[in-house]
């Protein structure tokens, strides 16, 4: 299968780049003794789970279908968490998960009887401190619904749970900032943690970022684990799949209205939603920082502000030219939608031997089925 013959748009996952990240994860585990569970909310493309499984300990989920997917397709430890469980949700995951983490003390009280004796029980705590560049993704934002606030904790709860989860980071590339959060938690919650079997520090710790001091992180996690006598967990998502995947698109038109725009056969609204939500411009492989030809890379959706980025190029772009939107694995394939009835990107993996393998493709029948299965009678 030749990449140049593949119809755009498509995602291309690079196995070699994925393994580079996984080897760093392996190093962190060896230094720290931490267990790593893949955050399926970020990346759930199970077609490459066989590459990831030898390196990680399992999966963590934010909804019942993710729990089932992790259990069926990944194995290892299956962690279940949800901001709000219904009783049906809990019954659905009770026999699948190794650990279940409740978001509130009221949820814990309402549903623990369903999972007692089946899964290790945890509670999410909100430490009131966090590392997040945008308020939208800040778990400690004002009026946060995520986890139990410190001043609301009933101390008796720690006699009836096995572990806790703190999720307080979003793309934290600063090891010292993470260690400061770790120290804060140890100081504030240490007496409670000493009673537990395990502690998860959630996700958002970007330990595969270039230059990240993995050894320093590992030693800090190990020290925390030994101090409180707990098994430590991290829930990486982006850290595992960062810089592994391109969204490959084709320029279908060039227009100008005070600025040149290259319209491509994809859309942030449908295929790379976080670009739109967080207003974080994408990066293009073919771009040049000092290029003389500047373009808006615009989508083919009807949303006026739907664009990937503004980029410069050494040569003028032309219709039919392919562009590679870099770092397009995290929170993309899990958020694909059918806005405007646009063609959904296929998904491929380039193996280390150069072979291209198809993982998924979509067609009109998928679009139609997502909207209705039956007509009114």
Swiss-Prot record:
Modified residue annotations for N6-(pyridoxal phosphate)lysine: 41
Cofactor: pyridoxal 5'-phosphate
Protein name: Carboxynorspermidine/carboxyspermidine decarboxylase
Source species: Vibrio vulnificus (strain CMCP6)
Coiled-coil blocks: none
PANTHER family reported in the protein's UniProt record: CARBOXYNORSPERMIDINE_CARBOXYSPERMIDINE DECARBOXYLASE, DIAMINOPIMELATE DECARBOXYLASE
Subcellular location: Cytoplasm
Uppermost EC category: lyase
């Amino acid at each position: 299968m030749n990449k140049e013959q593949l119809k755009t748009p498509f995602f291309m996952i690079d196995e070699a780049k994925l393994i580079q990240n996984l080897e760093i994860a392996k190093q962190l585990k060896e230094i720290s003794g931490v267990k790593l569970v893949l955050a399926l909310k970020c990346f759930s493309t199970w077609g490459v789970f066989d590459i990831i499984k030898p390196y990680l300990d399992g999966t963590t989920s934010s909804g019942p279908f993710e729990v089932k997917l992790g259990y069926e397709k990944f194995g290892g430890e299956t962690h279940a968490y949800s901001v709000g469980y219904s009783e049906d949700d809990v019954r659905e995951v009770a026999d699948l998960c190794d650990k279940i983490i409740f978001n509130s003390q009221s949820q814990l009280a309402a549903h623990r009887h369903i999972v007692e004796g089946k899964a290790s029980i945890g509670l999410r705590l909100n430490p009131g401190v966090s590392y997040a560049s945008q308020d939208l993704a800040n778990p400690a934002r004002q009026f946060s619904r995520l986890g139990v606030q410190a001043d609301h904790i009933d101390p008796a709860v720690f006699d009836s749970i096995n572990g806790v989860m703190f999720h307080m980071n979003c793309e934290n590339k600063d090891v010292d900032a993470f260690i400061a959060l770790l120290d804060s938690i140890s100081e504030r919650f240490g007496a409670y943690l000493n009673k537990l079997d395990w502690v998860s520090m959630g996700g958002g710790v970007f330990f595969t970022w270039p230059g990240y001091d993995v050894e320093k992180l590992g030693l800090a996690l190990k020290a925390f684990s030994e101090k409180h006598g707990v098994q430590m967990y991290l829930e990486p998502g982006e850290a595992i799949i960062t810089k592994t995947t391109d969204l490959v698109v084709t320029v279908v038109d060039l227009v100008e209205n005070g600025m040149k725009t290259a319209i491509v056969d994809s859309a942030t609204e449908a295929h790379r939603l976080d670009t739109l939500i967080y207003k974080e411009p994408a990066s293009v492989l073919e771009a040049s920082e000092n290029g003389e030809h500047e373009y808006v890379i615009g989508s083919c959706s009807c949303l006026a502000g739907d664009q990937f980025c503004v980029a410069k190029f050494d040569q003028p772009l032309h219709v039919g030219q392919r562009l590679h939107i870099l770092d397009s694995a995290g929170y993309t394939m899990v958020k694909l939608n059918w806005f405007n009835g646009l063609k959904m990107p296929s998904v491929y993996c380039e193996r280390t031997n150069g072979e291209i393998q198809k993982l998924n493709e979509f067609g009109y029948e998928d679009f139609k089925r997502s909207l209705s299965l039956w007509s009114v009678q």
